[in-house]
Curated annotation (Swiss-Prot):
Residues 283-293 are annotated as: Important for interaction with BIRC2 and BIRC3. Gene3D superfamilies: 1.20.5.170, Apoptosis, Tumor Necrosis Factor Receptor Associated Protein 2, Chain A, Zinc/RING finger domain, C3HC4 (zinc finger). Residues 299-348 form a coiled coil. It comes from Homo sapiens. One of its GO terms (biological process) is positive regulation of JUN kinase activity. Its EC number is 2.3.2.27. This is TNF receptor-associated factor 2. Its main location: cytoplasm.
Amino acid sequence: MAAASVTPPGSLELLQPGFSKTLLGTKLEAKYLCSACRNVLRRPFQAQCGHRYCSFCLASILSSGPQNCAACVHEGIYEEGISILESSSAFPDNAARREVESLPAVCPSDGCTWKGTLKEYESCHEGRCPLMLTECPACKGLVRLGEKERHLEHECPERSLSCRHCRAPCCGADVKAHHEVCPKFPLTCDGCGKKKIPREKFQDHVKTCGKCRVPCRFHAIGCLETVEGEKQQEHEVQWLREHLAMLLSSVLEAKPLLGDQSHAGSELLQRCESLEKKTATFENIVCVLNREVERVAMTAEACSRQHRLDQDKIEALSSKVQQLERSIGLKDLAMADLEQKVLEMEASTYDGVFIWKISDFARKRQEAVAGRIPAIFSPAFYTSRYGYKMCLRIYLNGDGTGRGTHLSLFFVVMKGPNDALLRWPFNQKVTLMLLDQNNREHVIDAFRPDVTSSSFQRPVNDMNIASGCPLFCPVSKMEAKNSYVRDDAIFIKAIVDLTGL
């Protein structure tokens, strides 16, 4: 007899992903790598299939429920019931943890000479190395951890500052541009040499400062001279003849334009009168259009109200349809459950004798060989109407010592409705048979339960651990004689001795 599987308890703790492989100062062995992130294991956990994972990686994988072990699938060693990742069966691998933490490590930061063990790196140096590159939260640039504070205070172009002249907030990169427009920025008068004149008062100073050079008042008619404010009158006296000549020239140039403007004025009056007539016509048209717009707006509002009512009705009907779909879905589930129970009741027997026909044998065996469906459970059967509930479990490509060479057949004690009235542990002789369909050479094996085994105690879960015959029938024997497999089907018979019940 052989037990199928046992699931040890486990727990998970959330930490960080694995250590970078650049940390190790020696050649890295594959057994120290996480099967998920492929980095050095951090707080290793071992799954029931034997693969190791970082605590963080395993928790991430199991966040959506139990999963198939990707490493088993990749290595081609997937095993049904074993290659499953679940929190209840994973456990902390303290031996691997001690090995990993004792590995020699070096700091990966350029220029850092720190050396020690991986455990010392995690507890004393990780995240604290002054030469480690970190991201500046302001400018998003990379700076060394030891220089981060100085960078944030004096060098970061995105650091927050305030103008020392007007106290306006700005970032470091915009200080110079702000000084070009700052109203309090100090300026120096080129005329009188006065310093620290706020920009907002500089133009007032220029108007009153006698030393500032300003354009001549006749610059509009051609004088290009600039003179100090206090010498403006002296300049006008000295340049009186030139200014009069410039003024005369401007007047002579403007005279013909004035005549043209007079003629243009009469044309403009005529155009204005024409435009007034057109405007009156357009006003009448606009009044008509306004009334039409109001009518269309009222129609649109009525349509909008009707649309909202229709939308509310559609939403109400949609909600009812969803409720009906949910109700139909629940009824479908209930119907499927009832159909399954009816099928189980039709297949069940109540005298301790059960014959199980396995159809599509070739296809099911091929699926077992491929590892897709290695085991099949039979319908339940009973020793009596109120007796023990049992089923069979068969591995068409073998299990354990019989894998690949034998047909493995197991007996399973299931949780039944009348277990409280029965005698435990289960102690009835069990006979298992592969029937020769010519009724000559049946393959028979029998055993009496080991009452100390958990397989035969009163079930706590839906079914106990399977127990039976991993070497029940050689595959070669079945293939050599075609009377065991006929019409692509085999028959398994189980007989439970009812003596003493």
